[in-house]
Amino acid sequence: MTIKVGMISLGCSKNQVDAERLLAMLAGDGFTICNDMTECDAVIVNTCGFIEDAKKESIDTILECCAAKGEGSLKCVAVTGCLAERYREELAREIPEADVVLGIGSNGKIGEAIRKAVMGEHFTEYGEKESLSMEGERMLANEPWFAYVKVAEGCDNRCSYCAIPLIRGRFRSRPMENVIEECKELAARGVTELNLVAQDTTRYGEDIYGESRLPELINAVCEIEGVHWVRILYCYPDRVTDKLIDTIARQPKAVHYFDIPVQHASAHVLRDMNRRGDRRSITALCQKIREKIPDVVLRTTLIAGFPTESEEDFAELCKLVEEVRFDRLGCFAYSQEEDTPAAELEQIPEEVRRRRAEIIMELQMSAAFDFADRCTGRTLEVLAEGWEDGQYYGRSYMDAPDIDTRVYFTSEDEIEPGSYVPVLITDTDGYDLIGMAKAKEDTK
């Protein structure tokens, strides 16, 4: 009997890469991958365990899938990913309806586990977290023209609020030749946009080569035939060097986009977070990047309501947002994570944390709308992705998959999804851009 398996992957792009490797393992092991959950014999919930809201979403999804057992053909619910790794025995004990619970170091056992569970056995295993393989085939879980490429696993930064080192282990890079080979394989399959990811992408290579090799990796990936865009996500501010900035400025395929989660602006809050820097150093870095790459897009992530954040510290954070005017920004209310140093501190009330995060996003709205308005009149290369409400939509170099905005446009010519189209921006709709594709004769 062929077992049909579905996948629900939650959380970040790094977790999605793990899910894609799980799917490829199963397909290679004789399983049928099924997108219709009502027809699946088994479903995998690849969980996120990063912050409280993500944990709740993961648990709710597991419970929903468990409740669906008996409806249709579903016999097995398997739980993988960060929540399964972090809570191990607690998860198996508290949700006994889950038939399989695998820590990230046991992902290679997924086929064996599902076969046993479909026959009525429970399967629980937690291998060494640092044995999680970053190599192997992948079955892309998104559109076929872009992919995330995980260049490293784990993290050594030890930010005081973050549980990722507890879940994913120490930082460890992939050999450069392995990353390049994967990028070549993806390009051969028609992937034209490669998004390089890690917990700290700027640290890539330090553990293997004694120094960051991210600029060299970017140069090598940009040489691959068929690759059109190379994007770097998750840059640690202290490790954004002149060499990295100059590489992205010089390489035509490296998109002018920096994702730099700075987290805060107050020197003492950053110190309490076990991070470095202050508002001045962050502002200076952003100014330097903009001077070297005038059309660059700067994205950041902030945390509001960290335990030691005073009203003055929060005002400093607001000032950073107003001064730098990031082009893209996300702000999280601080989440108290078990077994982290920050969790032991006296906490700010949750309603205050959430309100502060809302204030940051309200401040950012002005900068984001101004940025969109400044795009009017520009011609942007847009990666067409689909059709909606009578118009095409896609992303420009300014938009990372899943997290940023869209460009909506009309066209006299038929547009194939996955193609790159020059689009004249004529208007805005909130954060999104509106435009018109240039006719083919206009682009000759």
Task: Go through the PLM ranges and name each one.
Residues 95-96, 117-120, 212-214, 248-249, ...:
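Short, hinge-like loop/turn segments at secondary-structure boundaries
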Residues 77-81, 86, 188-312, 322:
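Conserved SAM/AdoMet-binding glycine-rich loop
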